[in-house]
Amino acid sequence: MASRVNTSFTLIPKQKCRRSNHHSSYFCNTLDSDPQLLSTLGNFKVLPLEILHIILRYLSVKDIGMLSMVSKTVSQHIINYISTSSGSRRLLLQNFHDLDLPGTKEETALLEHYRALGLLFKRCTLLLPTKERLKYIHKILSEVSCFKFSGCSVPLQCLGLSCYGMFLQTLTAGWDELECHRVYNFLCELTNLSRKMQTVVCNKPGSARKLELRVRLFCRNVLLDHWTHRSDSAFWLTRILKPWPMVNQARLLYIIFGPTSPHDGQVIWQEMIEGPTDESSLKGLANAIKLLYDTGAKGWTADDVISLVDELSVVPREWLLENNARLLILSGNNICFTFMASKAVNGRAVELARLVVFLALVCEKELYCMDWTVRMMQKVCKVFSTAAERKSFLQSIANAFACVTMEMLQPVMSGDRDDDDRGFLNLFHLLHAQANFHKEVLYLTMNAISS
């Protein structure tokens, strides 16, 4: 008696493909039309689709990615598996809120999973045009609400956008600029990002705090934070900033990298205006400025970056000069000197002299070497074309020390003191800064005489 064939599984058809099988129709037609492609499945050709899917379930994402490179047929099989409900459930992990603290093993493992998933999609869609790749990937990822711009109700406690960013970074790594432009435009169209940016940069600062936070999180977690090479980060930051006028670029830079509240994550607009701030509040802005300046990002000249720094120092209103000085120090020697030289060339010597005073004050507070401030002043002096201009600049510095001292002394003398004596302490640091500054000038003079 002929043995009965077990029909509980769907066998891969050799002659004709059923039209009702939507996920595998393309695959079946391909096999029918070219028998050679059937051999590219190797030993898998005798397996029912369900068995192959079970095997894929036991493979790691990295192993599935390696398997997808065997042949176009195998790759198409894996794409079909990803499109199934069981495949998407297994691959699109969504435990974004079950993590206790940043940097834990669980968080690292989840990010690594999406890095591997990005590589898998990169390999499976290798032969598709960029536009088709993006459409297919969006179709799969759209099932995950936390990957959407406003898809999560608790964005500060969610790792979704970071995983999405890790996925995109791995997917697009090595793509040329034109393809990356298309990716950015696709994301902007998908999320209406440009319109949302327009809302936060054109309205009064703080009037749309929740939207500011969403823009910040999307730009940082999806577009900027996961790149290994600084040039890649500079490329994406340029895409974000360059469509806007300089004043809006500064606002957007502050939203993305400026200080935020530890309680609700919202941007603190008054931080630079109300009092001296600390390094942590300025570090993100300084790093972004250095990124654009040091990498020689396409579309940015030194003058562009300096203009951006100048514009940033009045967002939302003019900063305390101490905070401006701290930003310049954190931005590095080249940016600091170029910024100061620009003021010297444009005849703003008095303003520049006050800046020197606050550079000295920050160095005193943070225990930086005061010799740095003196040498920076000496370098800027050479920008002035005549001896009379240099002498006038040095006199302006002496006058600035006296004026700033009197400004800080007045509230102390009037008894208008803070609960924490901040004003008195600031005056104390300024007097020490002045003494150490002039000590370094004397050392410099003595060394010049002895040589």
Curated annotation (Swiss-Prot):
Q: Which InterPro entries match?
A: ARM_FBXO47, F-box-like_dom_sf, F-box_dom, FBXO47
List residues traversing the bilayer. none
Record's PROSITE patterns?
Answer: FBOX
Keyword Cytoplasm attached: no
On whether Glycoprotein is a keyword of this UniProt record, the answer is: no
Residue span(s) of domain F-box? 41-91
**SUPFAM superfamilies per record:** F-box domain
- At the top level, the lineage of the source is Eukaryota
Keywords for this protein: Ubl conjugation pathway
General function of this protein: Probably recognizes and binds to some phosphorylated proteins and promotes their ubiquitination and degradation.
Supply the PANTHER family for this chain: F-BOX ONLY PROTEIN 47
Subunit structure as annotated in this protein's UniProt entry = Part of a SCF (SKP1-cullin-F-box) protein ligase complex.
Q: What is this protein called?
A: F-box only protein 47
Q: Which organism is it from?
A: Mus musculus
Its gene?
Answer: Fbxo47
